[in-house]
Amino acid sequence: MGFTDETVRFNLDDSNKKEISETLTDVYTSLNEKGYNPINQIVGYVLSGDPAYVPRYNNARNQIRKYERDEIVEELVRYYLKGQGIDL
């Protein structure tokens, strides 16, 4: 499979956006309750894909694995840009 010079469109449907946001909140809470640095652990998972960054506590690992990492990144970027006042 080769690369192309054409721009590829990536779209995440609206129903997943809210679910991803809720899942990230739940996972953050679970990580915090277990004494981990939630931001570091979530970043580790998103960058590596290794589910060991997220504990099984409160089913956090299974929750975050329901979504592709690119979907999580898209939601994080969207949330950040909205927070910067960019109309999406």
Curated annotation (Swiss-Prot):
Fetch the InterPro entries from UniProt. Answer: IreB (IPR009309)
Highest taxon above the source species: Bacteria
Q: What is this protein called?
A: UPF0297 protein SGO_2042
Which residues does UniProt assign to the signal peptide? none
Q: Which organism is it from?
A: Streptococcus gordonii (strain Challis / ATCC 35105 / BCRC 15272 / CH1 / DL1 / V288)
Q: What does the sequence similarity comment in the record state about its family?
A: Belongs to the UPF0297 family.
